[in-house]
Amino acid sequence: MNITILSVGKLKEKYIKQGIDEYKKRLSAYAKIQEIEVPDEKAPEHLSTEDMRLVKKKEGERLLAKISADSYVIALAIEGNMKTSEQLAKNIEQLGTYGKSKIAFIIGGSLGLSNDVYARADELLSFSKMTFPHQLMKLVLFEQLYRSFRIMRGEPYHK
């Protein structure tokens, strides 16, 4: 299985990068993992509604340009469906069973995702109704993917 994690902005926090690197290493035993960061759009601190839409549109175009046409796209969004770790594992396993060997997870920037990204997404996934820094969500996503593969293989994982 090929999994791509696409996100907006460069990861700056060293401790988050270290955590992601650890989970990428662990995940390499189960799947081919690719991490792609697209530049965030520079914007003034106080944005109008139209400015926010334009920023999300530009960031969305950068994200969409990196997704292959045959990828199953899961966008992380507050309004998405929440799943247990077991449900996420089953979902990933079923995608592989039904021939979806390329999965792309998309994490938006600080303003969220554009309507075009939502339109391209095959599924919306939420980890919480709370808002989290997108860089922290990347670490959480990597951990949940690792946990999912351990669950799929019936391997123990510390709870």
Swiss-Prot record:
It comes from Shouchella clausii (strain KSM-K16) (Alkalihalobacillus clausii). One of its GO terms (cellular component) is cytoplasm. Specifically methylates the pseudouridine at position 1915 (m3Psi1915) in 23S rRNA. S-adenosyl-L-methionine binds at L76, G108, F127, S128, K129, M130, T131, F132. It catalyses: pseudouridine(1915) in 23S rRNA + S-adenosyl-L-methionine = N(3)-methylpseudouridine(1915) in 23S rRNA + S-adenosyl-L-homocysteine + H(+). Keywords: Cytoplasm, Methyltransferase, rRNA processing, S-adenosyl-L-methionine, Transferase. NCBIfam families: PRK00103.1-3, tRNA_RlmH_YbeA. InterPro entries: Alpha/beta_knot_MTases (IPR029028), RlmH-like (IPR003742), tRNA_m1G_MTases_N (IPR029026). The gene is rlmH. GO terms for molecular function: rRNA (pseudouridine-N3-)-methyltransferase activity. It is an enzyme of class 2 (transferase). Homodimer. SUPFAM superfamilies: alpha/beta knot (SSF75217). Its main location: cytoplasm. Belongs to the RNA methyltransferase RlmH family. It is found in: Cytoplasm. The keyword ATP-binding does not apply. This is Ribosomal RNA large subunit methyltransferase H. Its EC number is 2.1.1.177.
